[in-house]
Amino acid sequence: MGNVIVVTSGKGGVGKTTITANLGCALAKLGEKVCLIDADIGLKNLDIVLGLENRIVYTMIDVVNGKVSPQEALVKHKMLKNLYLLPASQIATKEMISPNDMKAIVKELIPHFDYIIIDSPAGIERGFRNAVAPAERVLVVTTPELPAISDADRVIGLLENFGFSDEKINVIINRFKPHMVKKGEMLTTDDIKHTLSLEIIAVIPDSEDIIVASNTGIPVSLNGNSRISKNFENLARRIRGEGVPLENDFVTVSKGLIDTLKDFFSKLKRG
């Protein structure tokens, strides 16, 4: 499994940046040295989610222009000393960076980190191509609605055209609502797996804790009182190759839904 990972999605608003931040924090909590790269030039948010917006001195554009090296532009996280961010510029455009620029930046950083995680812009334009250029593995974030699944499927097709095998692409289902699934009002994990024909690596239930965390600049992964932080730890452990069952992502689900979810997962395994 590659250690350069891009987190992408077919559309905006599915929680991609939040997942990037929390995955980075979860890996760092497990002792990994992690660099997060915000590749969403002009629309950067990763620094805000991490609570680092006031600590930025240099951005990726400064690196591309030769003003500083990639390492000189990094911002160290306040709470996790083995987590770093390479920020995006708010005033630049995606056309100011090329796929080769991204490859060069990652090539210089990778010897110093266990994992590099790139937050890709949503969609399939230039910024997306920049973000996936140096990646060895892809996490596609979607929510359990048909429009989001359709957009994710389109991105997966592009990734396959870029040479990514199915083994290098995994799906994260975000904002999953088990009570709606139980009533037949939301797609199941089984539905999504069969539609996208890819393995699901994590399910993140809908949680108010994530909204609160985004507004405070402290990722929910760092909140020991939030049960949803365990979901991101599960994801981080799977990224490291640990065999954490997908069922473990539902430890926060009410007891009344357990039988329903077990049925979904038994179908998923048979599929």
UniProtKB/Swiss-Prot annotation:
Disulfide bonds: none annotated. InterPro entries: CobQ/CobB/MinD/ParA_Nub-bd_dom, MinD, MinD_FleN, P-loop_NTPase, ParA/MinD_ATPase. Keywords: ATP-binding, Cell cycle, Cell division, Cell membrane, Membrane, Nucleotide-binding, Septation. SUPFAM superfamilies: P-loop containing nucleoside triphosphate hydrolases (SSF52540). GO terms for biological process: division septum assembly. Coiled coil: none annotated. GO terms for molecular function: ATP binding; ATP hydrolysis activity. The keyword ATP-binding applies. It is found in: Cell membrane. ATP binds at residues 11-18. Its main location: membrane. It comes from the Bacteria. It is a peripheral membrane protein. One of its GO terms (cellular component) is cytosol. Interacts with MinC and FtsZ. Belongs to the ParA family. MinD subfamily. ATPase required for the correct placement of the division site. Cell division inhibitors MinC and MinD act in concert to form an inhibitor capable of blocking formation of the polar Z ring septums. Rapidly oscillates between the poles of the cell to destabilize FtsZ filaments that have formed before they mature into polar Z rings. This is Septum site-determining protein MinD. It comes from Thermotoga maritima (strain ATCC 43589 / DSM 3109 / JCM 10099 / NBRC 100826 / MSB8).
